[in-house]
């Protein structure tokens, strides 16, 4: 399987996000990337949008519902939100949407900071494997992988996608 070029996806995502925000009459969204890949995608997306908006970062490690199964990630860092959440229009950005559990955890954490006016979900890739009813408003590409395959994003510059075979 050939993976898409992240730079080309980011360019199209910027156009799609602008259209989505315009349709909803959102003029000053607040951007938040989910560590680590989502932050890289958010930085590239802000650059493609020509935006100098501050970027918030979320580390959802403590909010995941599989925390007791997987344990604590060795590099947990605090979330950094340089703006209010209450009443704001948020653009939540992640690299890969698989089960939906990371996004659920991110939403739980965000609501601990306040009640946003809206949340627009942006993902570089949707792996079409959702376990929860979560879908991105803007997506770079949708892929279907075999059960033994995963996609890994490396970055921050350049962003590159790698297909990993867990069966090997």
UniProtKB/Swiss-Prot annotation:
Instruction: Find motif (PRPP-binding) and give its ranges.
Output: 90-102
In Gene Ontology terms, what is one molecular function of this protein? uracil phosphoribosyltransferase activity
Task: Spell out the InterPro entries in the cross-references.
Answer: PRibTrfase_dom, PRTase-like, PyrR, PyrR_bifunctional
Q: Which reaction does it catalyse?
A: UMP + diphosphate = 5-phospho-alpha-D-ribose 1-diphosphate + uracil
Which GO annotations describe the biological process of this protein? regulation of DNA-templated transcription
Q: Which keywords does UniProt give here? A: Glycosyltransferase, Transcription, Transcription regulation, Transferase
Q: Does the keyword Transferase apply?
A: yes
Enzyme Commission number(s) from the entry: 2.4.2.9
Top EC category: transferase
Any one Pfam family here would be: Pribosyltran
UniProt cross-references to CDD domains, sorted A to Z: PRTases_typeI
- Which family does the similarity line name? Belongs to the purine/pyrimidine phosphoribosyltransferase family. PyrR subfamily.
Q: What does this protein do?
A: Regulates the transcription of the pyrimidine nucleotide (pyr) operon in response to exogenous pyrimidines.
Per its record, how is this protein called by name? Bifunctional protein PyrR
Q: Which gene encodes it?
A: pyrR
